[in-house]
Amino acid sequence: MAVNVRDYIAENYGLFINGEFVKGSSDETIEVTNPATGETLSHITRAKDKDVDHAVKVAQEAFESWSLTSKSERAQMLRDIGDKLMAQKDKIAMIETLNNGKPIRETTAIDIPFAARHFHYFASVIETEEGTVNDIDKDTMSIVRHEPIGVVGAVVAWNFPMLLAAWKIAPAIAAGNTIVIQPSSSTPLSLLEVAKIFQEVLPNGVVNILTGKGSESGNAIFNHDGVDKLSFTGSTDVGYQVAEAAAKHLVPATLELGGKSANIILDDANLDLAVEGIQLGILFNQGEVCSAGSRLLVHEKIYDQLVPRLQEAFSNIKVGDPQDEATQMGSQTGKDQLDKIQSYIDAAKESDAQILAGGHRLTENGLDKGFFFEPTLIAVPDNHHKLAQEEIFGPVLTVIKVKDDQEAIDIANDSEYGLAGGVFSQNITRALNIAKAVRTGRIWINTYNQVPEGAPFGGYKKSGIGRETYKGALSNYQQVKNIYIDTSNALKGLY
């Protein structure tokens, strides 16, 4: 299937600052390609420090009036954004598929609808938020107000470009902040097109979108004196740099980082449900998911039943053209990611690991122009193996046999990460006990990789700081002000 790219994507994009697309301070551009075909999709502006200065100044000026708008006004605008996203769902989903390589069935059903739902959700959250009043005694009253912080500086990863942007933009502007956000230089196109919706709905300067290299303009955003709050989704290595910038400037930061999550299959699991959940955990979005269930811990009593079923299921996955609605797995997002995956396959071959399924790049039937990789299942002897400890970020699943629930818990916790995990069991008490014992921010029971609004998402340990996607996330973008009132008119007599 082929589409006319220009029906969806412009040949060039400027920076979106103060409600319009503008030229950058430099003529430098970055080529944006389709990872499934190698074709050039567009060229984006390579922002420089001067452009960051401009965007932050505009956001500061817009904050003065935006922060004073009523909650109901902001809520209505967020709803309008969500409605317009859904009205253009098919177009934006195709842009996401063209630019990211993920299947159209995923972008149509998940990426864009869930982005829209986050705008609707935070419209309701801000509209129903209430302050508090505490009568400390008969003459004193304490009022608690939640006020916006100011200018938010955000950078999002390349694996869910539009959805991750919505996770940050929706609560930030709902709370009354303005934002300067930068998508990945490899997958910026969906957010740039959605800028046209912001242009229709929001006052100028509330949302500003820069494009460029993370090490250049992204770093400049995080280290700008005019930015009052940082928000980042990406690797743990870069997360450290963002945390350092936040500490240096004494501003708060929300960090959603890497993971190496354990998916635990107990001996009483519904195996049909487990096989589907395992695939959801590691094959969804080609395994390019921070919460991927990339360590499979299988009870020894069912290991010999489950593994052959997984081998068959993995071999039947349709990997191919992301625009084909029958495709279940598309292209990895780029050559660097493909090479990284291959390096782990090579490490497996040189060790005592056993490749049970997959393990190869796919190049037949026209796939040689993209970065397609087979669903891969690898048995490792224990959790200390390189493949069980390091985040691969691809459709590569390591499987480890466990003897009981406690060993599963111990192995699940034997990781520097703590983002997510799963438990499959028909005994809810048993599953809950494991869920409580595993030190991660999210545990799915009898499903995996569900990311709805209204449920907090974020990690323990080196997987991040803070939570997103639920009403408590609004507080990430607010400051608390206390107004303390003395109504007694009485002197205290101390001076």
Curated annotation (Swiss-Prot):
One of its GO terms (molecular function) is aldehyde dehydrogenase (NAD+) activity. It is an enzyme of class 1 (oxidoreductase). Keywords: NAD, Oxidoreductase. It catalyses: an aldehyde + NAD(+) + H2O = a carboxylate + NADH + 2 H(+). The active site is at E256, C290. NAD(+) binds at G212, K213, G214, S215, E216, S217, G218. InterPro entries: Ald_DH/histidinol_DH (IPR016161), Ald_DH_C (IPR016163), Ald_DH_CS_CYS (IPR016160), Ald_DH_CS_GLU (IPR029510), Ald_DH_N (IPR016162), Aldehyde_DH_dom (IPR015590). Gene3D superfamilies: Aldehyde Dehydrogenase, Chain A, domain 1, Aldehyde Dehydrogenase, Chain A, domain 2. Signal peptide: none annotated. Its EC number is 1.2.1.3. PROSITE patterns: ALDEHYDE_DEHYDR_CYS, ALDEHYDE_DEHYDR_GLU. Belongs to the aldehyde dehydrogenase family. This is Putative aldehyde dehydrogenase AldA. It comes from Staphylococcus aureus (strain MRSA252).
